Amino acid sequence: MSSLGNLANTGLVNYISFCFLFFVLKFRYYPENGLTWMVAFVVLSFVIQLIINIYLTSLPELCGQADFNIAIYATIVPWMAIFVLFSVSLSIFPGWLRLFSNTFGSSAAYMYGLKETMDKIFTVENRTDAERDQTNFQLLKALDSLYSDRDTLIQELDISDVFFNEKGEIVWKSFTGTLKMLLLTAEIEQSTLKDLYYCILLKDNVAFFVWFMLIGILSVLVSTNTLMNEGCSTKKGGAFDIIFNRT
């Protein structure tokens, strides 16, 4: 049993390693959100788990030789019932990302330089100019609250309308509107806007990573459990038949 337990850990270790490497490379080369990378992740993780399951069936503790039928079955069922269903749900309900993007994601973004980027936007000079001619006390109080608690603003930023023009300049209309609402009319440098955009993308990428790591671990456990309990189609009996005296 202990040896079979060690074999079960093989899938978990490989999946977690793949998941971490995938998201590191994703943020490096394709940080934007979308469906393309999600489909690629599901397909690649399925192929890797299938290869691992085929390998596990070839071991003496299970079938003694590669059993493609049970390996495919043990991989398709959890990936279709859990992985694909969750991926579709996450696309339909993007608000689920907030659970981790505003916790783990925010921590990663601050380590990436989010605080320094926000400091460049909310400069003392910019704030002074914005408030100089204002006499509305309630407005100034609200602005002071936003200036001192930037996390709330960061959590509400929308990046769905971001695009880069033919000059490579970032165009972010919703954020520009937010700055005007905050009476910050000074022009923000392109490099600062891009840094902020990638900080927000990092928040989302970390959230996707945590979600897919958790749902992937569940899928791998279900897959491995199915593999070891279904029996082999290439030979009668197996390790679990002997252990539980099944005939």
Pin down the residues of each PLM region:
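N-terminal first transmembrane alpha-helix
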Residues: M1-A109, C199-G216, S223-G237, D241
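Charge-rich cytosolic interhelical loops and cytosolic tails of multi-pass membrane proteins
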Residues: A81-Q190
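Membrane-proximal, non-transmembrane alpha-helical segments
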Residues: T152-M213, V220-L221, M228-F240
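Compact beta-rich and alpha/beta scaffold cores in large eukaryotic transport/transcription complexes
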Residues: N245-T247
